[in-house]
Amino acid sequence: MTSEPGVAPGDSFFAGRNQVDDWRKVLLYDAAAEAGVLAALPASPAVMAHRLGLDQRAVRILLDALAVWDVVVAGQDGSYGPGPAMPGDDDEAVLRHHGRAIRNWSRVIDDRLRGAPVAPPAPQPGPGRAQWLDALAVFARRWAPTLADACLARFPDATSALDLGGGHGEYALELVRRGLRVTMQDRLEVTVLAQVDGRMADAGVEVFAGDFFGQLPDRAFDLVLLANVAHTYDATHNIELYRRILPLIAVGGGLAITAFVRDRDPRSAIFALQMLSGTGGGDAHTEHDYARWLHEAGFSTCAAMDLDGQPQSLVLARP
């Protein structure tokens, strides 16, 4: 998709200041994709409106606007087709995730400022949950090698790992490529989606379905990875989770936490809005917060480091 100067489409949601995709393009693209308009290309607005049960005038106006960014092109016969800037699968996943964030922020941040609690999340339909996982997987594929390098530099003798809250499975797959035996745990509805394409089974990743506040594997691991999970919880839940993880760490092993840490990268302060809008206590917690919580949970050492090119930081801890 055509981007503003300095903007990479795949960075739109986690971009720095003044580097984000045009909000108009993001919302228009997401609306067109959600309504099935893009999947119906090539066709005329009249044909698409009839086929999809949409308003013909609205379809035409939306397509004309998308043509400004070369997402679609108009033909001489009044039909529209995919344009040179039509995004590929990865960019589409990121743009749609970004679009949902814009709508969510505009709807709920005002409520949060006035102290209204976060409403319990409605059950996310299969397609919506899959789109969310797809967007997270785009970033994870980009960041996983750097994360694995850092974890194995700190725990070089690790031969087994638990990817806790592993979702899309990209980190688990990268650790398998490094020669580790890996178990990935997440909620049942997430693990079902993570296994659809068969990559987890082909790689030999063991999948453990369950809420990690209720059930964890009954054996120890050299490395426990908690990637992009801790910032979704408040202090109480973080401490409880670390206490539950502590017995799972084998002698000589440790815990690796990736999170948006507020005092280490300015993008984390922006990401905290996502936590404000969608969680009851999530935040871009500080490095001091993590050190204090880990110590209270029984860990003896804790150190934070930046990951090259990533907005998240890595917090490493040993029992």
Named regions from a protein language model:
Residues 99-256, 261-262, 312:
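Conserved adenosyl
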Residues 1-111, 116-118:
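N-terminal accessory segments
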Residues 298-319:
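Core SAM-dependent methyltransferase catalytic element
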Residues 24, 48-50, 134, 158-159, ...:
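Short, contiguous strand/loop micro-motifs
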Residues 258-297, 302-303:
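C-terminal alpha-helical "lid/dimerization" subdomain adjacent to the S-adenosyl-L-methionine
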Residues 27, 133-141, 279-284:
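Short acidic-aromatic active-site loops that bind/stabilize oxyanions
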Residues 71, 180, 299:
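Short phosphate-binding/catalytic loops that engage adenosine nucleotides
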